[in-house]
Amino acid sequence: MNHDFQALALESRGMGELLPTKKFWEPDDSTKDGQKGIFLGDDEWRETAWGTSHHSMSQPIMVQRRSGQSFHGNSEVNAILSPRSESGGLGVSMVEYVLSSSPADKLDSRFRKGTFGTRDAETDGPEKGDQKGKASPFEEDQNRDLKQDDEDSKINGRGLPNGMDADCKDFNRTPGSRQASPTEVVERLGPSTNPPEGLGPLPNPTANKPLVEEFSNPETQNLDAMDQVGLDSLQFDYPGNQVPMDSSGATVGLFDYNSQQQLFQRTSALTVQQLTAAQQQQYALAAAQQPHIAGVFSAGLAPAAFVPNPYIISAAPPGTDPYTAAGLAAAATLAGPAVVPPQYYGVPWGVYPANLFQQQAAAAASNTANQQAASQAQPGQQQVLRPGAGQRPITPSQGQQGQQAESLAAAANPTLAFGQSLAAGMPGYQVLAPTAYYDQTGALVVGPGARTGLGAPVRLMAPTPVLISSTAAQAAAAAAAAGGTANSLTGSTNGLFRPIGTQPPQQQQQQQQPSTNLQSNSFYGSSSLTNSSQSSSLFSHGPGQPGSASLGFGSGSSLGAAIGSALSGFGSSVGSSASSSATRRESLSTSSDLYKRSSSSLAPIGQPFYNSLGFSSSPSPIGMPLPSQTPGHSLTPPPSLSSHGSSSSLHLGGLTNGSGRYISAAPGAEAKYRSASSTSSLFSSSSQLFPPSRLRYNRSDIMPSGRSRLLEDFRNNRFPNLQLRDLIGHIVEFSQDQHGSRFIQQKLERATPAERQIVFNEILQAAYQLMTDVFGNYVIQKFFEFGSLDQKLALATRIRGHVLPLALQMYGCRVIQKALESISSDQQVISEMVKELDGHVLKCVKDQNGNHVVQKCIECVQPQSLQFIIDAFKGQVFVLSTHPYGCRVIQRILEHCTAEQTLPILEELHQHTEQLVQDQYGNYVIQHVLEHGRPEDKSKIVSEIRGKVLALSQHKFASNVVEKCVTHASRAERALLIDEVCCQNDGPHSALYTMMKDQYANYVVQKMIDMAEPAQRKIIMHKIRPHITTLRKYTYGKHILAKLEKYYLKNSPDLGPIGGPPNGML
């Protein structure tokens, strides 16, 4: 009831924000005989699971905590165990996080009271762990973990109050936690040979079968013992069920009251037939005394000989919980039931109340359903009566039996789907999902849909029959015929749903198509389903239109799914609900892991967890998958099928991949799903029976960060061995991510041609986008390096027509440069690319990005193709030479262009040599000419320098040119420059003395010492010697002294020859 107020506190929280984790419960010894269900009283809190420091809104405004009165009216269990607050009255969100789909332990209530300690030791003991092989190369040995879990369970007097084995921690809030792989879970939770004493389970002939294949559902190996005797555990699955093993099949409901089946745990005192008869009597009485849900009960009995229903009825005082052990024991005596107050439920527009309830028709449907189910149950106790939506049939005949029994549910009465959805409600509530209503305590309960604009399409209805369209009625009739039932159209539609117009069933559409059961029910499902499942679609055009989808609901969505969706956020858990017993589905509830990512049922993270397409999910009853869909009947809120609803909805639940399979936030946790089924819920058309060997992510699954789930998983190191082929459909996105781009670059270097082609096919369509991307441009460049010629030319063709904007763009200019480097200049595409710059040369040259493109063109393209660049420079050489980027282009021209092309450039340079040598950029051009130019060009520059050596040597930029003149001038020119320094006087001192003290000129002196011929060097030394004492006072004079000391140490005192100069010109 309080679920939605809890949701208010969680609405804005993204799934990425995993909180610091505390244990929910610390082990301690508790021998109290009080209720040990999941709803613990105030006195039974062991430790606050989350502190208020993390959740300032964990106690919503105006929600007062009621001590001693929980929402289901039991004063003994007076608080709800909430994961978000130490205030116990805040809803069921712990269930979504902790117990969500199927905790692995179904415990006898007597074991809960203190004798449970030996169970894990017997089933998951060290010897069990030692026998288990590693399920995955990425999984480390888990013996230590298993033993630790055993220790905890032994210490814990209550067993595990949340009904979940510690190993089942798929959605663990600790990011570093390990997780069990699907196969590992099967092996670890595998066949149990040591049942606890007192439970007396029936033999399970399939429990000890080895794991058949990697993808086989754990339920196939660990069948529910209740299934063996034809007793079906219900959605509310009040455990205590006689399953002595951790089994994903033995899924436990959210509200773990332990007592629903306590009625049957008289240690084999009653036979199966007696139990079944007793339960049918109970429900018949309940239906009689509560006629408005008689159809619900009758439909609920259809899938198996017995379907426990949460809406029974205890003779206990009205103030007590009708679902406690005492209440059920009283109900077993068939005393007067305690009627649960009816609630309002939300119904989509277009479904109208009938205000009439044909009890006789409902009773007939109930009888028929019971008889059919009983007859289905009789043929053999060794065959599982209801394999469940997540299991494969053990034998073909059994699969047919299961299909018929399952389809009987929708066939017997259209109230099945709605009734089973009702049955999924919380204790005390018989309806699914009102957007807002008052509960029996007078508190206003607002459904999560109210915050996401769901109020409009859903209205409150009294719990009366509703009218449905004639096509849906025909669908129900066709389902009845296909399911093998003898119900007439009238009998099958006179229950909770009444047709607007009745028509005879279409017999020609009654053939069964078991193979098409395996199709994934995508949200806009166009997959072909059986008539029994398809014809029960609420909004389908008719039973004979496999691919039709009207009003946005997949034609494969079952009647229960559609009605349940209107009331519970499309809570059908996707499978073909009425006839999916033989389908291979990994439903959310079929896994022993907490949030095992199902094949096609869960909402992607960051998308609405509760609702899809604007339909309300259940606030307190938590809209349930139908019993025929989910073998474990977990109380997990039905996730939206494809997250097409409002992205502002509640972000609850675990991390999922693109197909919606829940994963842990722990790094490396994704490894175990690499070979598991994960077909996408939205785009999948592949069979669930044969899941793909590699993960498939949904392109539309966008994380709150904007990244897809595959990329998010990769960034969080969940894919240690990701390959390029795993990125199909995500290449462009990965290329635009820092880590994804680096990954693709590394793989492309060693990729096979086929793998490169896979990548190339995707990036070619987004080539321009990637070329201008900060990370994507590197992937394009890598293709220019390692791609085939055809691939290079194809990418170059994408550049063509965009050369100028790319050249001026920070990242695009790099792509163009790489293309120019990697493609031969004689290719026509290169010439065409270069010609696009014609008319924009100066713009590019002066651009910080474009100048690199022009330089690369000059370097890589034939000079004859670059005449337009030379022409553009005419009259602009001085300006460009003094430009920070233009000076670079001038130097490239001088290096690579022909003499005819460089001649006009040099002439302009010589005209401005004096200015250029003193310019911060122009001096580089002059130096470049001195280093690489022709001798006549060097001589022209030296002649410009002569007579100005002293002045220019003291200039910051010109001093560099003077050094280059000393280095690269001819011997005669060098001697003239040195003599100018030695012989010239600067006031009282020589020019040499002035230069030695100068911060720039001292480098010219050092260069002269190095380059001078021996005779000239001796003269320089004698000129310097008188100033040695003075030079020691100056910072730059010390450089000269260091140079002198080097020569004095190397040479004789007379400063004779010291060998040739460094340039070898002597």
UniProtKB/Swiss-Prot annotation:
The modification Phosphothreonine is found at residues 183, 395. Widely expressed. Expressed in embryonic stem cells, heart, kidney, lung, skin, intestine, spleen and thymus. Expressed at intermediate level in brain and liver. Weakly or not expressed in muscles and stomach. Expressed at various stages of myeloid and lymphoid cell development. In the testis expressed in the spermatogoni, spermatocytes, spermatids and Sertoli cells. Residues 394-406, 515-525 have a biased composition (Polar residues). It is found in: Cytoplasm; Cytoplasmic granule; Cytoplasm, Perinuclear region. The modification Phosphoserine is found at residues 67, 70, 82, 102, 136, 177, 181, 587, 592, 684, 700. Residues 106-203, 368-408, 490-551, 620-650 are annotated as: Disordered. This is Pumilio homolog 2. The pumilio repeats mediate the association with RNA by packing together to form a right-handed superhelix that approximates a half donut. RNA-binding occurs on the concave side of the surface. PUM2 is composed of 8 pumilio repeats of 36 residues; each repeat binds a single nucleotide in its RNA target. Residues at positions 12 and 16 of the pumilio repeat bind each RNA base via hydrogen bonding or van der Waals contacts with the Watson-Crick edge, while the amino acid at position 13 makes a stacking interaction. Its main location: cytoplasm. Residues 706-1048 form the PUM-HD domain. It comes from the Eukaryota. Residues 959-963 are annotated as: Guanine-nucleotide binding in RNA target. GO terms for cellular component: cytoplasmic stress granule; cytosol; glutamatergic synapse; neuronal cell body; nuclear membrane; perinuclear region of cytoplasm; postsynapse. Homodimer; homodimerizes in vitro. Interacts with DAZ1, DAZL and NANOS1 via its pumilio repeats. Interacts with NANOS3. Interacts with SNAPIN. Recruits the CCR4-POP2-NOT deadenylase leading to translational inhibition and mRNA degradation. Interacts with DDX20. In case of viral infection, interacts with DHX58. GO terms for molecular function: lncRNA binding; miRNA binding; mRNA 3'-UTR binding; pumilio-response element binding; RNA binding. GO terms for biological process: adipose tissue development; chromosome organization; hair follicle development; miRNA processing; mitochondrion organization; positive regulation of miRNA-mediated gene silencing; positive regulation of RIG-I signaling pathway; positive regulation of sprouting of injured axon. Pumilio repeats lie at residues 726-761, 762-797, 798-835, 836-871, 872-907, 908-943, 944-979, 980-1022. Keywords: Cytoplasm, Methylation, Phosphoprotein, Repeat, RNA-binding, Translation regulation. Residues 1-260 are annotated as: Interaction with SNAPIN.
